[in-house]
Amino acid sequence: EIDFPKGKIMIAYGLLNGEIKEDMDVVKILQDCSLCKRCEEDCPSNIKIAEIINGTRYKLKNLLPEHKKIYENFHKYKNIFGEENFSYGNGKNAFFMGCLVKKEMKDVIISLLDKIGEDFKIISECCGYPLRKIGINFKKKNLDGYEKILFSCPNGMIEFMKHSPIHISQFFSKCDFKRDGKNYIYHDSEFLGRYLKIYEEPREIIKKIGNLIEFKENRKMARWCGGEIEYKLAFPEKAEELAKYIAKEAKEKNATIVTS
């Protein structure tokens, strides 16, 4: 039962009420959840399951070894992977690229923003939200002074909600794109979808480029893909199984490209 929401809620309740002592098994049980909120869509009692689990994590005194590593990397490098950050430009607007976008994408992103004709400063460091998901507090980066702030990663948008963040799909959805006629299957990420309610803009862009294919379970009912980095590092086998499930359906539907 500990693999299911009810079991994790019971563990959280017992820990918070002193009925259960914290040990590494308890830590592992409470961290073995991506906070994707998919279970909340099926919950008839409307229990805020992700909020309860995440809140309980802040009470934990111990970290999983994989989580300790990303915590150390963030505080040393401002990057959970321990990689070197970069910045580009000095515009009045900012594009918070974050740590999850591949560095090879930098030139593509710069080219797109240059074509729009607006000045952007590109920031590549981690927003830190993965640490909040595992129950760690830290001082938030100051992004005051920018007129607009774009994000490619929904984690960053959630971390900086007070700045009225704009997702790149929202920013580019009104632009024209060259069609390639390929079949694109779109996967709704849990944080862009269930947390931020951004569903249509990515689909609008895909329809301009090629053919949109939907997963059987989509939008607020979309399954999690196993890609949240803090979960994937700690539970790689489970994350891989989730990814295989998504990949299997994409293959069955003859998708050329899986995008999210």
Region roles according to the model:
Residues 1-3, 36-39, 226-230, 234:
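Cysteine-cluster motifs in flexible loop/terminal segments that predominantly coordinate metals
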Residues 3, 9-164:
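Iron-sulfur-cluster electron-transfer modules
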Residues 46, 100-168, 191-260:
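Cofactor-cradling patches in redox/metallo enzymes
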Residues 94, 184-185, 256:
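Conserved beta-strand elements of the Class I
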Residues 166-182:
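Ser/Thr/Gly-rich flexible loops in soluble cytosolic domains mediating phosphotransfer, phosphorylation
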Residues 187-189:
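Alpha-helical transmembrane segments of multi-pass integral membrane proteins
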